[in-house]
Amino acid sequence: LPILVMLFTSCGIDEEKADTNTKSESDTGKALFIRNGCAVCHGNAGRGDGPVASSLKPPPRDFRDRASYKKGRGVEAISETIKLGVAKSAMPAYPHIVPADRRLLALFIESLQSENSLDDNEE
């Protein structure tokens, strides 16, 4: 019984650590998003409303819209899109961003999908 109690107690600690790491990773990803110029097209909140967005055809993706992810909306798919870019769009390839940073960017972008859903109340 003491062993079971210890196992259950330690599991809770690991979950808290995982939540903190995910939040920290997302915050780092957001900083990378700004620093690498993603916000110029996608906007600071990833809504596709950056300063140059209106001049781009097709317009930049609104990361809240799950249907707009053409190559998948998971971390690996987003990371690969960052690396390779999107053909026939203004989205360039970013192969110079190291894989660990691309992953952090992808975690941030993925987090935008669940923060808000598109509805009639948002503009």
Question: Which residues make up each language-model segment?
Answer:
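Sec-dependent signal peptide recognition
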Residues: L1-P2
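Conserved loop-to-helix junction within protein kinase catalytic domains, corresponding to the end
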Residues: S54-L56, N121
